[in-house]
Amino acid sequence: MRDAEQSFTRIEAIRKANSDPSYVNDRIYRLMYKEDLYIAAYEKIKSKPGNMTPGQDGTTLDEFSIRTIRNIINKMKDESFTFRGARRVLIPKANGKTRPLSVAPPTDKVVQEVIRSILEAIYEPTFSKNSHGFRAGKSCHTALKQVRESWSGVTWVIEGDIKGCFDNISHSKLIDQLRLRIKDERFINLIRKALNAGYFENGAFFSATLGTPQGSIISPILANVFLDQLDRKVEQLIKDHHQGEEGDKITDPAYRKLQRQKTSLRKKAEKQEGAERDATLSLAREANSKLLSMSPYLTRNNGFIRVKYVRYADDWIIGVNGPKLLAEELRSVVGEFLENAGLELSIEKTHIRHAKSETAKFLGTNLRIGSENSKIMKVLRNGKKFPKRVAGWTPVMYAPMNELIAKLHSRGFCDPKGNPTTVNKWIFLDDNQIVEQIGSVWRGIMNYYSFIDQFSMLSRIQFILQHAAAKTLATKHRSSRSKIFSKHGANLRVRIRDKAGNVIRQVEFPLIKSWKTSPKRFKIGTVDTNFLERSLRLRTRSKLYSPCVICESGDRVAMHHVRHIRKMGQEIKGFKRVLVSLNRKQIPVCHECHLKIHQGKYDGISLKDFALPHTAAA
């Protein structure tokens, strides 16, 4: 255990040293010899969805053992370890296109997790606070929270999208970026091997010359390392264009004059008719167009300017409190910078939106800065509250209702107009499973959009899914929606009983009781920042050193894995029933017992027959 602590202490020392962005790391390849880093890596990924999906070689994490780790380390020592080609599958996207996903062999995944933990120790301390994708303690919600809290006053929003970002990252440019902080060619070459591993698609092998493989464990952090240069570039632009101070900000007289002119023209048009009215409204629209291209404020040096920036993976937005010309200039500068890095702005997705009159989109959320109408707010002066008319320049966020309904339609919950439908693919499930499945879809949507303004907009989505669940139950039982609600209530409560008829559990559709808007209701979890303690915990709980829990033999012990311990609509049979009773997806077994499990010879065994039942249950 002391050796384990030394391994993790070294990683923690690397993390602390790299709080200095100029620090250069050397002799880190030797960490790839540390058995305990592989054990912690295995423990971290062993139960994640997809890790029982076979790679191209047909292997899974089943039969993973200490011997597997030691074989990897021996290959690391003579530098003969190679990453095998991943199996590529195409995943459908909402727009009808597909995105590639790579399924790597299990040993490759464990090695990648070790590499990822080392790269995280090197780069995480100095990653930008504006970068939120694939980082501990960061998420879509932290990115949107940053916009909510710091984007007041923004007049223009640049929606940024990098065309095929993950697929087009230059390997040579990425390696050059890594070499700025890593002076260890053996470690660099190991990463190069991972990048060059290629993939199999429909049985044919394709070499990889560009991009980080999607679905790879190290792909997200490598993308963040590469895009960190974009973060630094934009942050320099933020400093370069920082102009004026808050106390210097005054309203531009020309802006106020044009504003009064627009208001006067609209009032005049209300009293007119026909062609005369149309001509006046045309002048009002012309005045409004000029207003949209102007900043409302001046400073002593004739211009108050602020630039904001947030990035999540390859999605980013820039906010400009200043003229549209500056927004256009920034888009051009960023596009040129990305081109020099070997990437390309997606022209069809990179828009400049007026923050008040147009809607920008970021991370599935519609974004505007305030509204066009002024409102009365209470301000505090000398301890007393006074009413003040303000223009409303704070960020406002909404759910994209039309897109959500279209997505629900594509998944069979409603028709194109949002009318609930029977979910035919689930009518063969148990009643509680139908309510749980459809309820989980609704729970995911309401949790993601918990922070939006006008939260009650989501009542439409709740209605669709609540009634889709009721219609599915009605179809299954050849009944009607009204009878289902009469029997189970509005929340579709289903009671689950044991063989004696006793209620052991009940399931309900998660209905919202209060539609009160809470703009600060972001779902942000706590972060376990103690790497040493967390890693030792993973290492300590590992059963990779344990004997066989069935017969207590120490001969060729490996982990027996199952893909699921519970799966809706399927009866649990055979040896899997033991794992269900243990609530475990992996147990250590010797080679002989492992063969018997797969041959079905232990299908009738129970936990009391195990030589080490407590180890199995731990």
Swiss-Prot record:
Named cofactor requirement(s): FMN
Induction per the UniProt record: Expression in nicotine culture is about 5 times as in glycerol culture.
Biological processes per GO annotation: homing of group II introns; mRNA processing
GO molecular-function term, one example from the UniProt record: metal ion binding
Superkingdom in the source lineage: Bacteria
InterPro entries tied to this protein: DNA/RNA_pol_sf (IPR043502), Domain_X (IPR024937), RT_dom (IPR000477)
Annotated SUPFAM superfamilies: DNA/RNA polymerases
Keywords for the protein's UniProt record, in alphabetical order: Magnesium, Metal-binding, NAD, Oxidoreductase
Domain Reverse transcriptase: 72-367
Disrupted gene: phenotype observed: Deletion of the gene does not affect nicotine catabolism.
Record-listed Mg(2+) binding positions: D161, D314, D315
Function: It is hypothesized that the pyrrolidine ring of nicotine is oxidized by NicA to form N-methylmyosmine. The spontaneous ring opening of N-methylmyosmine due to the addition of water generates pseudooxynicotine, which is further oxidized to 3-succinoylpyridine (SP) by NicA through two hypothesized unstable compounds and the removal of methylamine.
Annotated family: In the N-terminal section; belongs to the bacterial reverse transcriptase family.
More info: No similarities to sequences of bacterial dehydrogenase or oxidase are found. Moreover, the reverse transcriptase catalytic domain analysis revealed three possible magnesium binding sites in the nicA sequence. In addition, NicA has no significant homology with other genes for degradation of heterocyclic compounds. Therefore, the sequence of NicA seems to be unique among the sequences of bacterial nicotine catabolic genes and more closely related to sequences of higher organisms.
Listed name of the protein: Putative nicotine oxidoreductase
Native source species: Pseudomonas putida (strain DSM 28022 / S16)
Gene name tied to this protein: nicA1
